[in-house]
């Protein structure tokens, strides 16, 4: 179809939207809305930007020999030239970028490149990850350049310090998240996020907060990075739904979530306030002792420390005991959007830093929506503008 969309994504500061179509790819500016680049280059399944620079990463759909889904192209849109091409053993399922690292996700591998020279610096063996569940912090500072991905399933290979694979013999770790330092190229912690497999991960702009959702999609949790302390627990809904997108605003006090339902939820995070009781500072890094009452916690510490090495013993001990994390009810949304898209339509969402803030929703149906968010009252957001990303529909469909 000439008027269909394969892929949509925001750039790292939510100022642009990249679009992949059966004909090629397009870049749109969010405010003011408008197309700023397009190229007919065959079907594109992944189009990721590096902030507002002319550097983009594209992966084809395989409709043409030069657009193999195993081939990643780094393109300079200003010069309209290909900087380099990288070919992988299997299809590329996801791409993440910041100013220091390019991360490429395959079915069971993650490749990390130095973006300044496109040299491979690290490879991580993972469990099968067909959904490319992963997040890379937009910040590439020395302290907060983190990559997060599902903790590998148990295998016969144990973790050895200095190697790039983490494995653990403990069962039921499908909902755990690995925090990986992209500067030191070492795992630094494991987050016990959910009991069921992960569906979506998101890091805030400075790499200090991690949002997680499982394949149930009813609960969204927010953890500190890299300490892995649970800070918030939000309820999206009562019935399971696939989570498509989670994004913090740049100030990290609002978080938007889209799913296979018609509702987009906006949650409020207040500075210094969490939905779980605080633990004294000396308790946070304490190493649990094995007593009958703390057997489960000690087991987590013992197994996790075996996986991550002795240097992480204190960090793994920062997991909050169940008696703390289970005492508070999850918080509900602060504001919401009722979408007009068909149920199940994939979408990505973000919250702007404007005053008042706006919620941006982009769908695979090919529409870009702008909603106003009332920070005082919350509640349902008002649609102010709607645009089409399709070539056969031009201009604003709603609003001025």
Swiss-Prot record:
SUBUNIT field: Component of the PI(3,5)P2 regulatory complex.
Keywords: Autophagy, Endosome, Membrane, Protein transport, Repeat, Transport, Vacuole, WD repeat
Any single Pfam family the record assigns to this protein: PROPPIN
GO biological process terms on file: autophagy of mitochondrion; glycophagy; nucleophagy; pexophagy; protein localization to phagophore assembly site; protein transport
Domain note: The N-terminus might form a beta-propeller domain involved in specific binding to phosphatidylinositol 3,5-bisphosphate (PIP2), leading to the association of the protein to the membrane.
Cellular component, GO annotation: cytosol; endosome membrane; fungal-type vacuole membrane; phagophore assembly site membrane
Membrane topology: Peripheral membrane protein
Record carries keyword Transit peptide: no
InterPro entries reported in the protein's UniProt record: PROPPIN, WD40/YVTN_repeat-like_dom_sf, WD40_repeat_dom_sf, WD40_rpt
Coiled-coil ranges (or none): none
Protein known as: Autophagy-related protein 18
């Amino acid at each position: 179809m000439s008027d269909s969309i394969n892929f949509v994504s925001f750039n790292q500061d939510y100022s642009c939207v990249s679009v992949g179509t059966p004909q090629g790819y397009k870049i749109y500016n969010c405010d003011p809305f408008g197309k700023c680049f397009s190229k007919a280059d065959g079907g594109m399944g992944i189009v990721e930007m590096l902030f507002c620079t002319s550097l983009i990463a594209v992966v084809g759909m395989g409709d043409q020999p030069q657009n193999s889904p195993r081939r990643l192209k780094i393109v300079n849109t200003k010069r309209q030239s290909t900087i380099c091409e990288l070919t992988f053993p299997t299809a590329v399922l996801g791409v993440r970028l910041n100013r220091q690292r390019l991360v490429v996700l395959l079915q069971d591998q993650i490749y990390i490149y130095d973006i300044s020279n496109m040299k491979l610096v690290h490879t991580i063996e993972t469990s099968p990850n067909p959904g490319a569940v992963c997040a890379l912090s937009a910040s590439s500072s020395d302290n907060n350049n983190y990559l997060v991905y599902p903790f590998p399933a148990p295998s016969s290979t144990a973790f050895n310090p200095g190697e790039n694979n983490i494995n653990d013999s403990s069962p039921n770790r499908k909902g755990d998240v690995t925090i990986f330092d992209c500067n030191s190229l070492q795992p630094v912690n494991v987050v016990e996020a959910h009991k069921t497999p992960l569906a979506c991960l998101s890091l805030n702009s400075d790499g200090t907060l991690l949002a997680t959702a499982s394949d149930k999609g009813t609960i969204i949790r927010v953890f500190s990075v890299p300490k892995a302390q649970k800070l918030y627990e939000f309820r999206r809904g009562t019935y399971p739904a696939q989570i498509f997108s989670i994004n913090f605003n740049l100030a990290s006090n609002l978080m938007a979530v889209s799913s296979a339902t018609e509702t987009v939820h906006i949650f409020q995070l207040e500075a210094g306030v969490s939905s779980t009781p605080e633990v004294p500072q000396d308790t946070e890094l304490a190493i649990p002792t094995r007593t009958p009452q703390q057997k489960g916690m000690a087991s987590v510490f013992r197994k996790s420390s075996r996986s991550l090495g002795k240097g992480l013993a204190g960090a793994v001990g920062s997991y909050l005991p169940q008696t703390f994390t289970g005492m508070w009810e999850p918080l509900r949304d602060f504001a919401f959007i009722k979408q007009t898209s068909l149920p199940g339509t994939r979408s990505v969402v973000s919250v702007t830093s404007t005053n008042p803030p706006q919620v941006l929703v982009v769908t695979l149906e090919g529409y870009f929506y702008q909603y106003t968010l009332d920070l005082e009252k919350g509640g349902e957001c008002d649609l102010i503008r709607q645009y089409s990303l399709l070539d056969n529909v031009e201009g604003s469909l709603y609003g001025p």
